[in-house]
């Protein structure tokens, strides 16, 4: 993964700009997997998306050969720069104009595409915030 992505309406973008050591994480991988598993849990339990799997080398959550959630992080002094994005109900045609994440022939999908249901980004965000119980409300803010 890496290189280039697209952010737009109908997509949830999560930038957890915190020093992960202050929250008990012992490694970058543990921090990234915690967030990925929280997102996976909400997409499965709340949205009904099935067969989600995390791929380290492709930096995201996948359903077979289709990418639904992305991570792009660089860490500076144990604080992540950038974060995660999740396709909820966004227009996927924008991805056809780029090579998403530097992966040729990458198929991009969304919650809407996978389930046929339209979820509000705010509702999914609220569920993800609830899934991340170790953080207090002052750390995670929504726009």
Predicted feature descriptions by range:
Residues 1, 6-9, 16-143:
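Catalytic beta-strand/loop module used to bind and position nucleotide/cofactor moieties
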């Amino acid at each position: 993964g890496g290189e280039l992505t697209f952010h737009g309406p109908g997509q949830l973008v999560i930038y957890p700009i915190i020093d992960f050591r202050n929250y008990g994480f012992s490694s970058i991988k543990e921090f990234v997997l915690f967030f990925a598993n929280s997102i996976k849990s909400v997409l499965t339990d709340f949205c009904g998306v099935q067969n989600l799997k995390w791929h380290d080398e492709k930096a995201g959550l996948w359903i077979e050969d289709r990418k639904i959630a992305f991570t792009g992080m660089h860490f500076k002094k144990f604080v992540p720069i950038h974060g995660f994005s999740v396709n909820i109900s966004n227009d996927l045609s924008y991805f056809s104009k780029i090579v998403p994440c530097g992966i040729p022939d990458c198929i991009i999908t969304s919650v809407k595409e996978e389930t046929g249901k339209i979820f509000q980004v705010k509702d999914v965000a609220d569920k993800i915030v609830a899934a991340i119980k170790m953080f207090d409300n002052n750390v995670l803010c929504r726009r």
